[in-house]
C-alpha cells in the first residue's frame, strides 16, 4: 500500500491533502504563538502578584510563625514558577515554533516541487502518446490521399501514353513518402506504448512514492515538534513538581497545636495576683448596729429578705434550666460538627465548619457564664437561707428603740427621725419591688414592646436586598442603623450600624423560631429592632453598639414586587432576564431581573446601574422608575423604550434610513454623553447595542452596568475582566484607565456603527487582531456613503493620546453644524 501503487489517478486528492496539512500547520503555529503569549502573560501576572504582596508583613520581629514561613515560601516558589513559565515560553518560541515555521516553508516547497514535476512528466506523456501520434496520423492520411491521387494520374498517363515517366516519378515519390511516414508512425507508436507503460509503471509511482516519503518525513518532524511542545509545556516537569513539593512541605510543617508556642513564650506574663474582695469596714465606723458580712434580719428587712430569697430561688431554677438547655445544645452541636467533619472530602472543607465551631465555643462560654451565675445565686441563696432558718418562728427585733429616743430629743428632732424612717421604709419598699437590682443579676428581663403586625418590608428602616457597600454609604453618624437582606445569602437578614467611627454588620440569628442577636429572642424582626431601639440595650456585649437613628429608605425609588407585573420576555442581559411589564397604574415598563445564584460582586454591579441612574434626568438617558429590593430576586424597573436596541434597529431598517436621520441619532448620543460628562459619569460600554430607540426615533443611552461615577473624572480598573475590546480605548485596555476621553473613543466606534448601518467594527478581524492593529496605528476607513465631515470626527475620536481627543461639547457642536448642512 502506498501513494505510487494506489494513487496514480488521485492527483487532486494528493493536492487537497497537502493543502489541508498546510492549513493545519498554520493553525498549530498560531496556537503555539498564542500559547507563548499566554504563558508569558501568566508568568508576568504571577510575578506581578508576588510584587504586590508586602513580604515584610509576613515577617514577625519577635514571633516565629510556621504559617508566616509557609506563606513566605509560597510567594518565593510562586516567583520561581513565574521564572520557569517565562523560560518555558522562550524555549517554546525558539524551539517548536521556530522549527514549525521552517517546516511550513519546507512543506510548501515539497508541494511546489511535486506540482512542477507532475506537470512536466504528464505534459511529456501527453506529447508522446497523443500530440505527436495525432500529427503523424494526420500526415499519414494526407500522404495516402496524395499517393492515391498520383496513382490515378499515373494510370491516366499510361492510358493516354503521355508523360508516363513523369507521372510514374510522381507516383513513386508519393509512395516513398507514405512508406517512410508509415515507418515513423510505427516507431512512434512503439515509443508511445513504452512511454505510457513507463509513465504508469515507473515514473509516476516514483514521484508519488517520493511525495509519500517526504510527507512521512514531515510527519516524523511534526511528531518531534509536538514532543518538544509537550515536554516544554508540561506542568509535571521536575522543576515545576519541585516548586509544588516545596509548597506542600511548607504547608505540612504547619502544626495548629504548636503554632502559638513561640508566641506564648515571647509574650508570657506572670499571673496577676487576684484582688481580694472584702467588706469595707470603714463603712461601719459611724454605725454600731451593722456587722460586716452579716445579713441584717429585723423588723425592717424581714419581709424583703423573704422576697429576695424567693426571687433568688426562682432565678437559680431558671439559670439551671437554661444551663441544662445550653449543655444539651453543646452536645448536639459537637455531634453535628463531628458528623460534618466525617463527610468532608477535602482538607479545606474544614473552613465550612469554622462558623459552627465558633458557635460551639460561644455556647461553651455561655455555659460557663451560666455556671458562674448558678454558683453566685446558690451562694447568695445559701446566705439568705441560713439567716432566715436561724430566725424561723422568731419575731423580728426592732431596729430603733423609739421610746428611748423620744426622751432625749425635741419635737423637731422627732420629726427629723420620723422623716428618716420614712425614707428608709420607702427605700426598702423599692428593694422589695425590684430585688434583682440589688443582687446584680445577670439575667435580663424580657421586655417585649408591641410594634404591631406590620410586615418587615413596610418599615422605613428596612432597605431590602441592597448591597453592603450601599448600606455603608447611608450610615454616617453615631447610632445610624438599617436592616437589609444579605446579598450573599438570600433569606438571611443583617443589621448595619455606624458605631465609634466604624460601620458594623450583625447577622440576625434565627434560632428556635425566634430572632435575636445574643440576648432576648422575638417572634419577628420588627419587634427585635424596636426592643433594642427603645430600650437602648446593646446589640452584643462585646461590641457595645446601641441603636439611635433609624435610616429610612428612599421611598421615591423603592417599589414592592407586588407593584409590578411581569409580561413577555424581551431578552437576556448580563445579570438575568429582561421582561416587559406593567405597574399597578398600567404604566408599561422594562424589568431587569437579577439571578439569585449570581456571585455577590455581580449582584452589587447589577444594582450599581440603578444607583447611577437615580441621579440622572435627560431625554437621551433611559429613565429609572424604581427598584424592587425587598426580597429576591431583585428587580430594576426602567422606562419601556419601544424601538428596541439601536444595533438591531440599524440592521433591520438599513434600507430606509436616511443620512439626516443617522446624524440625528449621533447627535442624540452626543447630547446624552455630554450630560453624563457633566455629572462625572464614565459609561465604559458605549456602543450601538447599549442604546435604545424611543418614540419619534429618539435615541437613549442605556446599560450602565459597567459605568462609574468619579469625582476626578478618571476611573482605574485592574484585573482580568470581560471588556468590549473593539469599542475600548487603548489606555483603558493597556492600563485600565477609564475617563470621558475613553468614552469619546467609544463614541467614535458608535459613529462608525451608525453610518455602516450596523456592521461589526474592524470587520474580518478578531478582538486581538483589532487591538494589535490599533496599537500599530491602523484606523478603520470611512463607511460607504459616510459624509467626510463625520469621518473626520471619527478620526479625532480615535487619537491615540486621550488629551488630544475632542470633548463631548465640541462633538455636539460639530454634529449640530453637520445636521444643518444635510438636506
Swiss-Prot record:
EC main group: transferase
Tissue spec: Detected in liver and testis. Isoform 4 is detected only in testis (at protein level). Widely expressed.
Any Pfam family matching the protein: SH2
Biological processes per GO annotation: actin cytoskeleton organization; adherens junction assembly; adherens junction disassembly; cell adhesion; cell-cell adhesion mediated by cadherin; cellular response to macrophage colony-stimulating factor stimulus; cellular response to reactive oxygen species; chemotaxis
Gene3D superfamilies for this protein: Arfaptin homology (AH) domain/BAR domain, HR1 repeat, Phosphorylase Kinase, domain 1, SH2 domain, Transferase(Phosphotransferase) domain 1
Spans annotated as Important for interaction with membranes containing phosphoinositides: 1-300
Inducing factors: Up-regulated by insulin in myogenic cells (in vitro).
Key words of the record: ATP-binding, Cell junction, Cell membrane, Cell projection, Coiled coil, Cytoplasm, Cytoskeleton, Kinase, Lipid-binding, Membrane, Nucleotide-binding, Nucleus, Phosphoprotein, Proto-oncogene, SH2 domain, Transferase, Tyrosine-protein kinase, Ubl conjugation
Sequence positions bearing Phosphotyrosine: 402, 616, 715
Positions of the catalytic residues: 685
Compartments it resides in: Cytoplasm; Cytoplasm, Cytoskeleton; Cell membrane; Cell projection
Record-given protein name: Tyrosine-protein kinase Fer
Organism of derivation: Mus musculus
Gene: Fer
Amino acid at each position: 500500500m502506498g501513494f505510487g501503487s494506489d494513487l496514480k489517478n488521485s492527483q487532486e486528492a494528493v493536492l487537497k491533502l497537502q493543502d489541508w496539512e498546510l492549513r493545519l500547520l498554520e493553525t498549530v503555529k498560531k496556537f503555539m504563538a498564542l500559547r507563548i503569549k499566554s504563558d508569558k502573560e501568566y508568568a508576568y501576572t504571577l510575578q506581578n502578584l508576588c510584587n504586590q504582596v508586602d513580604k515584610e508583613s509576613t515577617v514577625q520581629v519577635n514571633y516565629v510563625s510556621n504559617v508566616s514561613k509557609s506563606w513566605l515560601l509560597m510567594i518565593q516558589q510562586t516567583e520561581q514558577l513565574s521564572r520557569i513559565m517565562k523560560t518555558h515560553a522562550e524555549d517554546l518560541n525558539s524551539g517548536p515554533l521556530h522549527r514549525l515555521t521552517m517546516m511550513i516553508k519546507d512543506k510548501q516547497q515539497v508541494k511546489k516541487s511535486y506540482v512542477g514535476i507532475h506537470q512536466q512528466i504528464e505534459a511529456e506523456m501527453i506529447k508522446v502518446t497523443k500530440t505527436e501520434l495525432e500529427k503523424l496520423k494526420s500526415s499519414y492520411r494526407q500522404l495516402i490521399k496524395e499517393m492515391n491521387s498520383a496513382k490515378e494520374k499515373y494510370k491516366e498517363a499510361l492510358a493516354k501514353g503521355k508523360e508516363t515517366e513523369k507521372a510514374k516519378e510522381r507516383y513513386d515519390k508519393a509512395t516513398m513518402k507514405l512508406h517512410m511516414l508509415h515507418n515513423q508512425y510505427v516507431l512512434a507508436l512503439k515509443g508511445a506504448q513504452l512511454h505510457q507503460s513507463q509513465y504508469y509503471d515507473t515514473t509516476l509511482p516514483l514521484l508519488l512514492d517520493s511525495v509519500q516519503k517526504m510527507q512521512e518525513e514531515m510527519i516524523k518532524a511534526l511528531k518531534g515538534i509536538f514532543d518538544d511542545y509537550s515536554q516544554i509545556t508540561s506542568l509535571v516537569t521536575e522543576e515545576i513538581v519541585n516548586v509544588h513539593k516545596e509548597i506542600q512541605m511548607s504547608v505540612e510543617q504547619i502544626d495548629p497545636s504548636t503554632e502559638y508556642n513561640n508566641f506564648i513564650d515571647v509574650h508570657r506574663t506572670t499571673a496577676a495576683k487576684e484582688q481580694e474582695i472584702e467588706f469595707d469596714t470603714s463603712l461601719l465606723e459611724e454605725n454600731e448596729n451593722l456587722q460586716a458580712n452579716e445579713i441584717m434580719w429585723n423588723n425592717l428587712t424581714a419581709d424583703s429578705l423573704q422576697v429576695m430569697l424567693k426571687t433568688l430561688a426562682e432565678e437559680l431554677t431558671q439559670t439551671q434550666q437554661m444551663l441544662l438547655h445550653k449543655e444539651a445544645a453543646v452536645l448536639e452541636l459537637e455531634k453535628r460538627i463531628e458528623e460534618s467533619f466525617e463527610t468532608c472530602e477535602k482538607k479545606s472543607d474544614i473552613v465550612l465548619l469554622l462558623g459552627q465551631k465558633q458557635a460551639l465555643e460561644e455556647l461553651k462560654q455561655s455555659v460557663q457564664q451560666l455556671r458562674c451565675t448558678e454558683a453566685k445565686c446558690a451562694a447568695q441563696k445559701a446566705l439568705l437561707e441560713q439567716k432566715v432558718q436561724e430566725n424561723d418562728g422568731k419575731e423580728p427585733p426592732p431596729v430603733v428603740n423609739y421610746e428611748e429616743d423620744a426622751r432625749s430629743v425635741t419635737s423637731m428632732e422627732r420629726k427629723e427621725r420620723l422623716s428618716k424612717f420614712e425614707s428608709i421604709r420607702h427605700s426598702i419598699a423599692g428593694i422589695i419591688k425590684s430585688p434583682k437590682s440589688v443582687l446584680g443579676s445577670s439575667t435580663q428581663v424580657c421586655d417585649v414592646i408591641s410594634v404591631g403586625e406590620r410586615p418587615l418590608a413596610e418599615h422605613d428602616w428596612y432597605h431590602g436586598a441592597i448591597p453592603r457597600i450601599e448600606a455603608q454609604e447611608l450610615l454616617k453618624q453615631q447610632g445610624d442603623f438599617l436592616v437589609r437582606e444579605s446579598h450573599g445569602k438570600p433569606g438571611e437578614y443583617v443589621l448595619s450600624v455606624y458605631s465609634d467611627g466604624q460601620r458594623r454588620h450583625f447577622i440576625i440569628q434565627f434560632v428556635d423560631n425566634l430572632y435575636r442577636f445574643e440576648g432576648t429572642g422575638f417572634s419577628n424582626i420588627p419587634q427585635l429592632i424596636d426592643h433594642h431601639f427603645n430600650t437602648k440595650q446593646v446589640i452584643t456585649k462585646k461590641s457595645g453598639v446601641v441603636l439611635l437613628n433609624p435610616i429610612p429608605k428612599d421611598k421615591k425609588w423603592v417599589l414592592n414586587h407586588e407593584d409590578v407585573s411581569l409580561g413577555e420576555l424581551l431578552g437576556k442581559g448580563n445579570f438575568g432576564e429582561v421582561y416587559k411589564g406593567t405597574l399597578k397604574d398600567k404604566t408599561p415598563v422594562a424589568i431587569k431581573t437579577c439571578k439569585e445564584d449570581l456571585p455577590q460582586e455581580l449582584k452589587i454591579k447589577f444594582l450599581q446601574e440603578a444607583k447611577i441612574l437615580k441621579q440622572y434626568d435627560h431625554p437621551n438617558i433611559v429613565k429609572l422608575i424604581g427598584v424592587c429590593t425587598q426580597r429576591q430576586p431583585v428587580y430594576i424597573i426602567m422606562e419601556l423604550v419601544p424601538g428596541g436596541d439601536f444595533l438591531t434597529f440599524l440592521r433591520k431598517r438599513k434600507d430606509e434610513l436616511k443620512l439626516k436621520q443617522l446624524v440625528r441619532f449621533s447627535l442624540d448620543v452626543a447630547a446624552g454623553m455630554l450630560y453624563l460628562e457633566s455629572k462625572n459619569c464614565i459609561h465604559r460600554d458605549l456602543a450601538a447595542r447599549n442604546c435604545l430607540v424611543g418614540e419619534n426615533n429618539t435615541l437613549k443611552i442605556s446599560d450602565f452596568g459597567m459605568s462609574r461615577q468619579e469625582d476626578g473624572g478618571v476611573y482605574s480598573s485592574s484585573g482580568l475582566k470581560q471588556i468590549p475590546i473593539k469599542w475600548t480605548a487603548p489606555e483603558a485596555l493597556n492600563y485600565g484607565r477609564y475617563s470621558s476621553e475613553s468614552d469619546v473613543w467609544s463614541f467614535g466606534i458608535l459613529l462608525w456603527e451608525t453610518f455602516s448601518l450596523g456592521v461589526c467594527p474592524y470587520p474580518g478581524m478578531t478582538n486581538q487582531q483589532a487591538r494589535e492593529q490599533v496599537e500599530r496605528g491602523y484606523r478603520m476607513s470611512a463607511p460607504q456613503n459616510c459624509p467626510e465631515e463625520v469621518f473626520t470626527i471619527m478620526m479625532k475620536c480615535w487619537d491615540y493620546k486621550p488629551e488630544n481627543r475632542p470633548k463631548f461639547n465640541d462633538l455636539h457642536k460639530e454634529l449640530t453644524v453637520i445636521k444643518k448642512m444635510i438636506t
